[in-house]
């Protein structure tokens, strides 16, 4: 794989954010030793794949779409499917379990499939720093962030050094393969043990009733990126546009970083990752709030060749995601009155007159992933780990 070098990076305390790198070739080999690009050979990709677990969150997705995504992930990487699918009037989760079983057998690959609302999570998380994930119902709370964190814990329990995320609603299976290769390339070459790579979609298309239109950026991302960059510009007194991935669901990180940072609930999860880094390891650095200091956090942003194409979600979904994403900034120490005013103006333009919600947060530090997963899988009658 060949990627362009980022044109620049910017430093915010102990956070180093790189500008966008682009995939130049999915399967190319330069004739001479390159100095103007990053070349990762097949051996390096394979070595990194064995160190990576790919997490696939799913909720009521078309089974064929999910199957194509799972079959596109390199077999060297174990897969963790975290399902929040409905079980009535049809038990969609049971279909996902059977699909995972068949793929595990046919491809001879390790797949864990866990149900987000499995009651076994309650006992497994009890007494750990993550017990607040369980609500009054005795089940893990609803939300994408909660599902991503459960997937991270399972991946860490399976021995991963790196954890990558691939959405299950992707209609272009080849993009799941490309994302995986990007994760392997970026994290295997990272210079910090506390690293993350976030995907910048080259195009984001939605399948509507008529034609498909490919946008350069998603509607929510455009707003979130703008507010984050505006916020950083105020602090640095220099205008910046360094953040291109405020709502990047396709991402990967080192287990060391994932265990140290806080995780946001629901749709807040992707934006809150950046907010947490900047709050604690930029503004809070001198006050001793950055748990990874004197090390630094490295954030890479990479643009793939494949577009991200999924089903149309509707304006209501877009407004909800925007409000939740901006809420992570609004309720943080990053937000000056000027920033809060801009956020409220953005929400008013979407027909939302109230302050954005403050997300719940979870901190896994001090949790033993292997102990949690062993307890969970022993108690569960619904979730499975198909190992070969």
Curated annotation (Swiss-Prot):
**Cellular location of this protein?**
Cytoplasm
Identify the pathway: Carbohydrate biosynthesis; 2-(alpha-D-mannosyl)-D-glycerate biosynthesis; 2-(alpha-D-mannosyl)-D-glycerate from GDP-alpha-D-mannose (MPG route): step 1/2
Q: What's a single GO MF annotation on this record? A: mannosyl-3-phosphoglycerate synthase activity
* Protein's UniProt keywords contain Metal-binding: no
Chief subcellular location equals cytoplasm
Q: Which terms are listed as keywords in the entry?
A: Cytoplasm, Glycosyltransferase, Transferase
Enzyme Commission number(s) from the entry: 2.4.1.217
Q: Name one GO biological process term.
A: mannosylglycerate biosynthetic process
Gene Ontology CC terms, in alphabetical order? cytoplasm
Q: Which top-level group of life is the source organism from?
A: Archaea
Which catalysed reactions does the entry list for this protein?
Answer: (2R)-3-phosphoglycerate + GDP-alpha-D-mannose = 2-O-(alpha-D-mannosyl)-3-phosphoglycerate + GDP + H(+)
Query: What family does the Swiss-Prot or TrEMBL record give for this protein?
Result: Belongs to the glycosyltransferase 2 family.
State the function annotated in the UniProt record.
Transfers a mannosyl group from GDP-mannose to phosphoglycerate to form mannosyl-3-phosphoglycerate (MPG).
Which protein, by its recorded name, is this? Mannosyl-3-phosphoglycerate synthase
State the species of origin.
Aeropyrum pernix (strain ATCC 700893 / DSM 11879 / JCM 9820 / NBRC 100138 / K1)
| Lineage per the UniProt record | Archaea, Thermoproteota, Thermoprotei, Desulfurococcales, Desulfurococcaceae
What gene, per UniProt, encodes this protein?
A: mngA
